[in-house]
């Protein structure tokens, strides 16, 4: 509580204090108009920058959605299409079939090489990965078997290839291979067991036998009884590949669409 007598006993002090207050107030500068302009300009710059960032996000999301989905067909002559026209091998037929089914934004890259062994395939992975595949269909090992290469070596190479592809963001579909029993039943069984074992251990989708429905049928293979005809490749595409591949394409396209939608939604800018 304030003592009123003490307050009245000090009029000069109060008057002096009021005088000082008036003098100080009179000496204060008016707000600088340049400072206000600078503040307005800063706010405007921040707003423009935020709008630019939002536009860039929308552009990047649109480009991602429009960028083709890349499927890499990686393997040996069975992939390359030895002995058939360029539009008859399985990668070409697969892309054409996908287009017919409405997947207009999907491209299939043929990276098959005749005579390729699992070791050779591993050695060219750096070059192959430049395609940045979203999905890779990997079929290799037949030439290793023809040469009688140790099963452990073949499996190690396939595991290396799968891991490299996965590390680079590609989902792998592994095409299983089976061989004739002229190499001995032990080798044949050990070789066939590679593919399901790798698929299970490395969490990849397996086509149990890539040539299922075609291998061993003279009507669907060329004179060498090894490489499919155009008709044989058609069966491989429609029956062996598409049932496994289509759900993966659908999932990837949905993910791209969701990413684009989220990125194109404007965020609130605080000014």
Which residues does each predicted region cover?
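N-terminal secretory targeting modules
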Residues: 1-72, 100, 131, 234, ...
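Conserved Rossmann-like nucleotide-binding pocket used by diverse enzymes
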Residues: 23, 109, 173
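Short, mixed-charge, low-aromatic patches
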Residues: 38-53, 76-84, 113-118, 150-155, ...
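Serine-esterase "nucleophile elbow" of acetyl-processing enzymes
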Residues: 53-114, 124-132
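Short histidine/acidic/glycine/proline-rich micro-motifs that form metal-
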Residues: 78-81, 85, 112-116, 143-145, ...
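Alpha-helical cap/lid subdomain in secreted, periplasmic
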Residues: 104, 120-271
């Amino acid at each position: 509580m304030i003592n009123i007598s003490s307050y009245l006993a000090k009029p000069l002090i109060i008057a002096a204090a009021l005088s000082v207050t008036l003098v100080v107030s009179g000496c204060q500068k008016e707000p600088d108009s340049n400072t206000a302009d600078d503040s307005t300009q800063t706010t405007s710059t921040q707003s423009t920058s935020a709008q630019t960032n939002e536009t860039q996000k929308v552009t990047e999301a649109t480009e991602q959605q429009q960028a083709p989905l890349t499927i890499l067909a990686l393997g040996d002559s069975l992939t390359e299409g030895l002995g058939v026209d360029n539009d008859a091998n399985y990668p070409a037929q697969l892309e054409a079939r996908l287009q017919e089914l409405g997947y207009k934004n999907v491209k299939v890259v043929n990276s098959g090489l005749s005579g390729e062994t699992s070791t050779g395939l591993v050695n060219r992975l750096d070059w192959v990965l430049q395609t940045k595949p979203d999905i890779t269909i990997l079929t290799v090992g037949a030439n290793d078997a023809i040469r009688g290469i140790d099963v452990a070596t073949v499996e190690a190479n396939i595991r290396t290839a799968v891991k490299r592809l996965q590390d680079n963001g590609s989902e792998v579909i592994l095409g299983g291979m089976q061989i004739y029993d002229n190499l001995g039943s032990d080798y044949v069984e050990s070789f066939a067991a590679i593919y399901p074992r790798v698929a299970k251990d490395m969490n990849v989708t397996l086509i149990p036998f890539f040539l299922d429905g075609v291998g061993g049928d003279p009507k669907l293979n060329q004179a060498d009884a090894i490489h499919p005809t155009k008709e044989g490749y058609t069966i491989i595409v429609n029956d062996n590949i598409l049932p496994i591949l289509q759900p993966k394409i659908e999932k990837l396209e949905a993910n791209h669409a969701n990413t684009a939608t989220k990125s194109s939604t404007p965020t609130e800018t605080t000014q």
